């Protein structure tokens, strides 16, 4: 049975882990790093993913895609704030979805995420030495149904069967509690990542990890902290120079990179200098941006964001029926929890210093790997049980446009619940089931996750027909809803899959394209590797020709130089089919020549050895003669020719 890998599909960075011998292992990528930037770049016909994509972002801002997680499963109208912040083009797709426009080719957020997942999949396969087809993928605890479904679709497009969707704070708690499964404790997981914020309250005991409540904000994270710095720098430059950097995509990409770097530096320093030379030319003269940003100024700029974390924490405690004093440990997850003022705020909320015993960048992937091992029946983990919750209430629209809840927020999943409703008018032949997710009393203020009709209701006065509506949430938090007329037995159901905006046919097409692109990426890498190898052979051959010099016979040297010229021409033309043949020809010629040189040297050494033997005999005779000529004086002389 193949391994089930754990993937933390993050807004800013992603990470992959696997269980080996009962221990979680975070797998380094091809660049040797434990985390991979969640960035995809389109460069001509090639795609770059991760660090290579990040390195070229400044010079290719409109085709470098980052923070795609913020668009997953969201309607186009809801992501306008995000669209205003990014340099790449996002347009409206079908079913009010978002699409990334790259030279007229429209990509869904799921497709972009799938490219990142493919990178994670390949990283795991290179490490394990075998194909990987199954994964546990993490999502923010406060992700809604459409966002979870979009994540499952991204996995499917990437060629992965998603065995389980697990909430990020829950995954972190699994990783934290792996060595503490026998202890009874209540923990709070404060997860502030690149684009989302979650707070979950869990109870651990006897190998059971039970989520008591969760809360959060799917549009609050490190990106927002970066953006307050970006706004500050752009405003400073406009105040000093009268120019708006926001109109220049390349300048904004440089500001983004500088803001992220400054934010990180301010976690360990009280001030940092942001120095961006040649940020914008004005009348042919270069303008530079040099600003000193202090930690206190950054905290002032971020004050609203910091305060935004307080209310979800208080709601999570209330939802769990606990107070801050009941919490034994606070776990910090996500790179943004390294910000000192965030740690101070967490200490204020819970009245105790948060634990720093886990790596905030890797712990979620580790937890996902543990969940994968649990699902595969890993005997090393004993009897570990995970009980998660649904983050938001679910219900339907009823008379008066109100939302009637069937499943309350923080209900343990999987869960199934039914309730009976009736008609609002006499002889009503059908009813529309409008499925909603959220906490507001009016239907219009909550999120629509699906609609369907139940037809064929027998004519009857208002209030007589009995319509049984059933909600079923699986372990991934994905919703199915059914409606049944008790009188006729007629039933209609819907699995909320289309809420992410993709049909089965679209997913199939995207999966086929992803497979084809993966093959194209492999071929592109092989092409680059072959050209690099040819370049290396050219360099080494020229070096050896120079080192051997006159030792190489003239005819052999001319032959090698002619073949070398052919290789240079093939390299320039990128004639991959010829390169291997020419390199083999050079290697064979050099091998034969090296053998000849070796044989010639060996023969020379043998001749020298024979001469030395003769010389020794002569020396012995001379010594005897010297004994008879003691009056002869030995002198050194140099023969002049």
Swiss-Prot record:
Sorted UniProt keywords: ATP-binding, Chaperone, Nucleotide-binding, Phosphoprotein, Stress response
One matching Pfam family: HSP70
InterPro entries with a match to the protein in the record: ATPase_NBD (IPR043129), Chaperone_DnaK (IPR012725), Heat_shock_70_CS (IPR018181), HSP70_C_sf (IPR029048), HSP70_peptide-bd_sf (IPR029047), Hsp_70_fam (IPR013126)
Disulfide bonds: none
Region called Disordered, residue ranges: 604-641
Phosphothreonine found at: 196
Coiled-coil residues: none
Biased composition (Low complexity): 604-634
Induction: By stress conditions e.g. heat shock.
Gene Ontology MF: a single term: ATP-dependent protein folding chaperone
Keyword Electron transport: no
Protein's UniProt keywords contain Thylakoid: no
Family: Belongs to the heat shock protein 70 family.
Its job: Acts as a chaperone.
The protein's name: Chaperone protein DnaK
Organism: Azobacteroides pseudotrichonymphae genomovar. CFP2
Taxonomy of the source species: Bacteria, Pseudomonadati, Bacteroidota, Bacteroidia, Bacteroidales
């Amino acid at each position: 049975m193949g391994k089930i890998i754990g993937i933390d599909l993050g807004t800013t960075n992603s990470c992959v882990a696997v269980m080996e011998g009962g221990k979680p292992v975070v797998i380094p990528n091809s660049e040797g790093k434990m985390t991979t930037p969640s960035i995809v770049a389109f460069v001509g016909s090639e795609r770059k993913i991760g660090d290579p994509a990040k390195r070229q972002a400044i010079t290719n801002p409109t085709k470098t895609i980052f923070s795609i997680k913020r668009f997953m499963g969201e309607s186009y109208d809801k992501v306008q704030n995000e669209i205003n912040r990014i340099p790449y083009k996002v347009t409206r797709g079908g079913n009010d979805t978002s699409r990334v426009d790259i030279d007229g080719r429209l990509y869904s957020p799921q497709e972009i995420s799938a490219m990142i997942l493919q990178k994670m999949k390949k990283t795991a396969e290179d490490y394990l030495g075998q194909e990987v087809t199954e994964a546990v993928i993490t999502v923010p605890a406060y992700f809604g149904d459409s966002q979870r479904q979009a994540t499952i679709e991204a996995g499917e497009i990437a060629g992965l069967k998603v065995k389980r969707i697990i909430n990020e704070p829950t995954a972190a708690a699994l990783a934290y509690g792996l060595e503490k499964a026998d202890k009874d404790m209540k923990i709070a997981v404060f997860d502030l990542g690149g684009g989302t914020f979650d707070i979950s309250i869990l109870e651990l005991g006897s190998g059971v990890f039970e989520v008591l409540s969760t809360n959060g904000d799917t549009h609050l994270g490190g990106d927002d902290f970066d953006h307050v710095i970006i706004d500050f720098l752009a405003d400073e430059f406009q105040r000093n120079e009268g120019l708006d950097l926001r109109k220049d995509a390349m300048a904004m990409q440089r500001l983004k990179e500088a803001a992220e770097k400054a934010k990180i530096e301010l976690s360990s320093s009280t001030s940092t200098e942001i120095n961006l030379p040649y940020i914008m030319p004005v009348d042919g003269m270069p303008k530079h941006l040099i600003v000193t940003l202090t930690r206190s100024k950054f905290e002032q700029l971020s004050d609203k964001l910091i305060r935004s974390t307080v209310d979800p924490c208080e709601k999570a405690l209330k939802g769990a029926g606990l107070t801050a004093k009941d919490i034994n440990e606070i776990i910090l997850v996500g790179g943004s929890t390294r910000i000192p003022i965030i740690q101070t705020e967490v200490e204020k909320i819970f009245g105790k210093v948060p634990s720093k015993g886990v790596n905030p960048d890797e712990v979620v992937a580790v937890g996902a790997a543990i969940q994968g091992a649990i699902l595969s029946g890993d005997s090393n983990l004993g009897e570990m049980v995970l009980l998660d919750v649904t983050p938001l209430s679910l219900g339907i629209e009823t008379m008066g446009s109100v939302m009637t809840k069937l499943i309350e927020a923080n209900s343990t999943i999987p869960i199934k619940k039914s309730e009976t409703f009736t008609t609002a008018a006499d002889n009503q032949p059908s009813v529309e089931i409008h499925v909603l997710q959220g906490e507001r009393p009016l239907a219009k203020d909550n999120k629509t996750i699906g609609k369907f009709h139940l037809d064929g209701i027998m004519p009857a006065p208002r209030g007589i027909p009995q319509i049984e509506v059933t909600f079923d949430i699986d372990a991934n938090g994905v919703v199915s809803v059914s409606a049944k007329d008790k009188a006729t037995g007629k039933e209609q159901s819907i699995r909320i899959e289309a809420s992410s905006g993709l049909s089965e046919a679209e997913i199939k097409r995207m999966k086929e394209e992803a497979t084809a692109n993966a093959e194209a990426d492999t071929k592109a890498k092989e092409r680059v590797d072959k050209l690099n190898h040819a370049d290396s052979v050219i360099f080494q051959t020229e070096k050896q020709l120079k080192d051997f010099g006159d030792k190489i016979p003239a005819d052999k040297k001319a032959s090698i130089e002619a073949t070398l010229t052919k290789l240079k021409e093939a390299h320039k033309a990128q004639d991959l089919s010829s390169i291997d043949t020419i390199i083999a020809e050079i290697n064979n010629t050099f091998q034969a020549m090296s053998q000849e040189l070796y044989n010639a040297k060996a023969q020379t050494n043998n001749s020298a050895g024979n001469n030395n033997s003769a010389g020794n005999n002569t020396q012995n005779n001379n010594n005897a003669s010297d004994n008879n000529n003691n009056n002869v004086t030995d002198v050194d002389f140099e023969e002049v020719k």
